[in-house]
C-alpha cells in the first residue's frame, strides 16, 4: 500500500528518472575508441602501480625526461581505477558514471519547470545528443559535470542571496585543477562575470537586468579571488593558473588538431550546432518573459566557445540547460505523455542492450592491430617515427614514441617539425635528417608515406592488414 502511494505521488519523477537513465544508456552507442584515451589510461595505470604523480615524460624517446604539465593526472588515475575494476567495459562505465549524474542534476534543478511542460523537456533531453561527439573515457567528461555544478551554484546564488551552494566553488576549482586543469579557470571567470553583471540595473525592450545586493557582489568577488588561489592547489602549482591561457594561445596546436577546429557552415556534420543556436534564439524571442541579461551573456559566451571549437558545444548545452527552462511556458499534458516517455526510454534501453556487443567492440577498437605491434616490438626501434594519432596506442603497448596526443608537451620541441615532416612541407628532408629516424610506422593518410615509398633509402620491411607500413632507413 505504501509502495502504491509512493508511486502515485512520485509518478512523473519516476518516469523522468527512468527516461533520463535509459537515455544515458542509449547514448553509449556513440562511445568510441580514442587514441588519446590509451595514453591517459597508460599514465593512470603507471601512477597507480608506482604510487606517484607523473610530471616528466616517460613515454617518448625524443622528449623523455622533459617536464610534462600533467594537468589531467587525477582523471588518468580514475580512468586507471575504472580499468582495473571493469576491464574492457571501463569506457562505458566511466561515461555512464559522469553522464547520468549530470543529466540528473539538470533534471532536479529544473524539476518544477520540467513538469509544467513535459513535451519541451522531452525535446531538450533528446538534445543531449550534442554531448555525443566526444563520448569516450577522457577528462573532458569530468569537466562537463564540474561545469554543470559551477553554473548551477552561481545562478542559484544570483537568484537567491540566502543560498550557500556558491561556497562549494573553491572545492570545485581544486578538483578541476587536478582532474582537467585546462578548464580550471572557469569557476573564477564565471564568478567575475556574475560580479560585473550584479551592478547592472536596466530594462530595455526585451532585455532586463536587476541590480544585486552589496552582499551578493562581495560574495561573487570573494569567490572569484578564492577560486584564483585554489587553482594553484595541484602538483604543478602556479603553472596551472596560466596553463589554460598558454594552451589556448597556441595557434599551431589549435589549428592542426581536429577536435579543436572551428565550427563551420561548410561542414554538414556541424549543421546540428547551428540548428541548436536557432532553437535557443527562438525560445528567447518567443518567450513571454523578458530575457535576463545574465542569461543572455552566458548564452553568448557559450555560443562563442562552441563556434571557436566543436569540442565546446557540450559546454553550450550544459550551460543552457540551467537557463532555458525559465523561458518555457506551461503546457497541459495529454493522456499520451507518460506513454511517450516510457516508450522512448524502453527503446533507448533496448537499443543499448542489442548494440552492447558492438559498443564494447568499438570502445576497445584499435587502429593498429596486434600483428603490427608485435612486429615493432620485434625490431626494437630506437628512433621510431610515428603519426600523431597513433601515439596513444603505441604508448599503451609500451613502445616509445616520437609524438602522441600531448600536443602541449611537444609544442616546445618537435610538434611543428612533425607537422612539416608528415605533410612533406617546407624543408622536411632536412628535418628528417635532423631526427635520424631508424624506422617509420606510417599509413597512406599522410604525404610522408608517398615520400618513403618513392625514396630508395627507405626499405619497406612490413605491410600489415591494418593498412600500416614499416619502413627502415638504409644509407
Report residues per predicted region.
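Short acidic/glycine- and proline-prone juxtamembrane loop motifs at membrane-interface regions
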Residues: 134-142
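Transmembrane-helix motifs of polytopic, lipid-linked glycan transferases
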Residues: 93-113
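Short periplasmic/luminal acceptor-recognition loop of GT-C membrane glycosyltransferases, typified by
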Residues: 377-415, 433, 437-445
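Signature aromatic-anchored transmembrane alpha helix within multi-pass, membrane-resident enzymes
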Residues: 224-225, 322, 329-354
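Membrane-interface transmembrane helices that cradle and orient dolichyl/undecaprenyl
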Residues: 150-166, 200, 282-290
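Membrane-interface alpha helices of multi-pass inner-membrane proteins
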Residues: 24, 127-131, 153, 166-183, ...
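Transmembrane catalytic cores of multi-pass membrane glycosyltransferases
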Residues: 33-36, 48-53, 181-286
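Transmembrane-helix signature of polytopic, membrane-embedded enzymes
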Residues: 106-129, 144
Amino acid at each position: 500500500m505504501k509502495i502504491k502511494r509512493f508511486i502515485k505521488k512520485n509518478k512523473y519523477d519516476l518516469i523522468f528518472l527512468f527516461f533520463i537513465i535509459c537515455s544515458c544508456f542509449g547514448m553509449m552507442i556513440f562511445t568510441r575508441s580514442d587514441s588519446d584515451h590509451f595514453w591517459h589510461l597508460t599514465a593512470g595505470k603507471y601512477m597507480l602501480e608506482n604510487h606517484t604523480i607523473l610530471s616528466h615524460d616517460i613515454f617518448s624517446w625524443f622528449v623523455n625526461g622533459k617536464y610534462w604539465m600533467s594537468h589531467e593526472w587525477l582523471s588518468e588515475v580514475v580512468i586507471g581505477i575504472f580499468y582495473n575494476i571493469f576491464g574492457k567495459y571501463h569506457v562505458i562505465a566511466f561515461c555512464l558514471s559522469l553522464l547520468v549524474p549530470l543529466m540528473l542534476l539538470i533534471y532536479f534543478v529544473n524539476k518544477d519547470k520540467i513538469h509544467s511542460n513535459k513535451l519541451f523537456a522531452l525535446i531538450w533531453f533528446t538534445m543531449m545528443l550534442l554531448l555525443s561527439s566526444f563520448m569516450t573515457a577522457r577528462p573532458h567528461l569530468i569537466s562537463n559535470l564540474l561545469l554543470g555544478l559551477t553554473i548551477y551554484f552561481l545562478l542559484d546564488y544570483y537568484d537567491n542571496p540566502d543560498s550557500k551552494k556558491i561556497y562549494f566553488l573553491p572545492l570545485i576549482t581544486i578538483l578541476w585543477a587536478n582532474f582537467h586543469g585546462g578548464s580550471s579557470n572557469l569557476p573564477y571567470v564565471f564568478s567575475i562575470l556574475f560580479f560585473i553583471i550584479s551592478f547592472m540595473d536596466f530594462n530595455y525592450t526585451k532585455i532586463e537586468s536587476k541590480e544585486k545586493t552589496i552582499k551578493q557582489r562581495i560574495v561573487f568577488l570573494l569567490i572569484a579571488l578564492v577560486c584564483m588561489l585554489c587553482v594553484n592547489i595541484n602538483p604543478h602549482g602556479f603553472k596551472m593558473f596560466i596553463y589554460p591561457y598558454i594552451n589556448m594561445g597556441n595557434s599551431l596546436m589549435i589549428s592542426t588538431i581536429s577536435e579543436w577546429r572551428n565550427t563551420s557552415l561548410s561542414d554538414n556534420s556541424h549543421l546540428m550546432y547551428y540548428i541548436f543556436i536557432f532553437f535557443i534564439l527562438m525560445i528567447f524571442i518567443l518567450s513571454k518573459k523578458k530575457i535576463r541579461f545574465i542569461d543572455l551573456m552566458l548564452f553568448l559566451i557559450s555560443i562563442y566557445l562552441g563556434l571557436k571549437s566543436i569540442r565546446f558545444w557540450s559546454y553550450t548545452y550544459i550551460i543552457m540547460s540551467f537557463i532555458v527552462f525559465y523561458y518555457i511556458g506551461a503546457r497541459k499534458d495529454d493522456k499520451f505523455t507518460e506513454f511517450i516517455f516510457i516508450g522512448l526510454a524502453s527503446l533507448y534501453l533496448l537499443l543499448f542492450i542489442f548494440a552492447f556487443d558492438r559498443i564494447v567492440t568499438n570502445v576497445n577498437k584499435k587502429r593498429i592491430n596486434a600483428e603490427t605491434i608485435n612486429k615493432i616490438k620485434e625490431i626494437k626501434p630506437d628512433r621510431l617515427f610515428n603519426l600523431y594519432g597513433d601515439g596513444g596506442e603505441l604508448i599503451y603497448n609500451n613502445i616509445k614514441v616520437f609524438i602522441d596526443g600531448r600536443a602541449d608537451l611537444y609544442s616546445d620541441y618537435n610538434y611543428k617539425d612533425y607537422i612539416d615532416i608528415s605533410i612533406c612541407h617546407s624543408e622536411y628532408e632536412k628535418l628528417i635528417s635532423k631526427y635520424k629516424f631508424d624506422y617509420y610506422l606510417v599509413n597512406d593518410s599522410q604525404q610522408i608515406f608517398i615520400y618513403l615509398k618513392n625514396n630508395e633509402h627507405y626499405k619497406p620491411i612490413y605491410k600489415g592488414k591494418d593498412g600500416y607500413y614499416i619502413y627502415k632507413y638504409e644509407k
